[in-house]
Every structure is written in C-alpha cells, then in structure tokens.
UniProtKB/Swiss-Prot annotation:
Classification via NCBIfam families: endonuc_V_Ttgales, PRK11617.1
HAMAP family (UniProt xref): Endonuclease_5
Enzyme Commission numbers on file: 3.1.21.7
Lineage: Bacteria, Thermotogati, Thermotogota, Thermotogae, Thermotogales
Protein name (record): Endonuclease V
Known role: DNA repair enzyme involved in the repair of deaminated bases. Selectively cleaves double-stranded DNA at the second phosphodiester bond 3' to a deoxyinosine leaving behind the intact lesion on the nicked DNA.
Site (Interaction with target DNA) location in chain: Y80
Needed co-factor(s): Mg(2+)
Binding positions for Mg(2+) per the UniProt entry: D43, D110
Keywords: Cytoplasm, DNA damage, DNA repair, Endonuclease, Hydrolase, Magnesium, Metal-binding, Nuclease
Organism whose genome encodes this protein: Thermotoga neapolitana (strain ATCC 49049 / DSM 4359 / NBRC 107923 / NS-E)
C-alpha cells in the first residue's frame, strides 16, 4: 500500500509538537456508511529499548478470518515521550504498510485517535498518511474526562475535552477495565463506537483486529511465528 509523505521523522520533541498542531487542522470527521469488507489491526511492540516491531493484520468482516499479515522490525530513534508516540512508532508502521497488498476499509490502532492533548494520536496521525478511515482503541486514558460506564458488556459513556465529545469509554466485558475509543481520521465518533462494538466478540476485552495484531506481535517477538 502507498501513503502520502507529510513530513520527515528526524525531529526534536519541540518540532514534533509543532507538526502535530499543524496536522490536527487537517483531520476530517465523517460517518462510516455500511459495513467494511476488510478491517486492519495495528500493534507495535519494543523487543529492545531501541528496536521496534510493527504488525498489521487484515481480516475479513464479519468472519474475522485473517487474509494478510505483515510486519516490520527495525531501529527506533525517537525517544518514548507520552503524546508523541506516533513519532516513535509511525516510521515502522509505514514500512509495514508498504508491504501490505490488501486494502482495508478501516484501520484500528492500539493507541489514541483524537483523545490526545493536541488531538493527534497515532490513529489520527497515521490516518493522514494512509488516507483511510482510522480508529484509536487504547487500553488506558491519555486525555479527556468521562463518567465510568456501567458494569455490563458494551456499556459506554462519552469521553470529553471540556464540552467537546472526543470519543467514548467502553466496557467490552463485564468486570473488566474499559477501553478508550476515539476517531482517528475520516470517521466520526458515532461510527467509531458502532464499529468497535461490532469488532469486539463476547468474552473479549479488545476488538479482534488489534487483539490479533497483539497476539502476532508477541509471537514474532518470541520467535514463535
């Protein structure tokens, strides 16, 4: 798959934040009509401090049969700084993306969309590069306020930045901690909620695309795949 090159990656943290403030103005929100045929999940891991591993899994929907899996392992130059993870993880993701042959209709990232201090988490940032609808699904809160959702499957409450709705907090499994869902690019909040609900199977905490991407990341990291 091809992508649009928006900026260089050899940047200082200050330069990275300036780029985020520029790119955030380019994010578009729109309803996702109908159902996807193919959905991708993205997960990144760091086997060593300066080595990263990116995995993209493409699945048929609604069967969640894996049709393609690609990965990229390489050196990571940008330091770990909360709020700037796209500058650490983005280059590896894009190298993996170039290997992909199946075009997904929507891409789910293990990370944030617009639920981010500068409204540009990795799902939003990479969405601008790949120009495909993206959703961020994070296991913990980075930004925003919310009311705790009820303790039942698929209960959720909105995530706010002051009075602006920037996503939702969804309890996908009774008794489990909620996940944090926010639109990345080319999709809106309501569509993101609808799709993540439909991607999450009973008894699972995470949506299948990122759950399977994480499983393969761990297998590759251990040399089991």
């Amino acid at each position: 798959m091809t992508y649009k090159k928006l900026h260089e990656w050899d940047l200082s943290p200050e330069e990275a934040m300036k780029i985020q403030n520029v790119l955030r103005e380019k994010i578009l929100f729109k309803p996702f009509e109908g159902e996807p045929k193919y959905v991708a999940g993205v997960d990144l891991s760091f086997p060593k401090r300066e080595e990263g591993l990116a995995v993209i899994v493409v699945m048929e929907y609604p069967t969640f049969k894996i049709v393609e899996l690609v990965s990229e392992r390489g050196k990571v130059d940008f330091p770990y700084i909360p709020g700037l993870l796209a500058f650490r993880e983005g280059p590896l993701f894009l190298k993996a993306w170039e290997k992909l042959k199946t075009k997904p209709d929507v891409v789910v990232f293990d990370g944030q969309g617009i639920a981010h201090p500068r409204k540009l988490g990795i799902a939003s940032h990479m969405g601008l590069f790949i120009e495909i609808p993206t959703i961020g699904v994070a296991k913990s809160r980075l930004y925003g306020t919310y009311r705790e959702p009820e303790n039942r499957r698929c209960s959720w409450s909105y995530l706010y930045d002051n009075e602006e709705i920037i996503g939702c907090v969804m309890r996908t499994r009774e008794g489990s901690a909620p996940i944090f869902v926010s639109p990345g690019h080319l999709i809106d909040v309501e569509s993101s909620i609808r799709l993540v609900k439909s991607f999450t199977l009973p008894g699972r905490r995470l949506p299948e695309p990122t759950r399977m991407a994480h499983i393969y990341t761990q297998r590759l990291k251990k040399g089991l795949f």
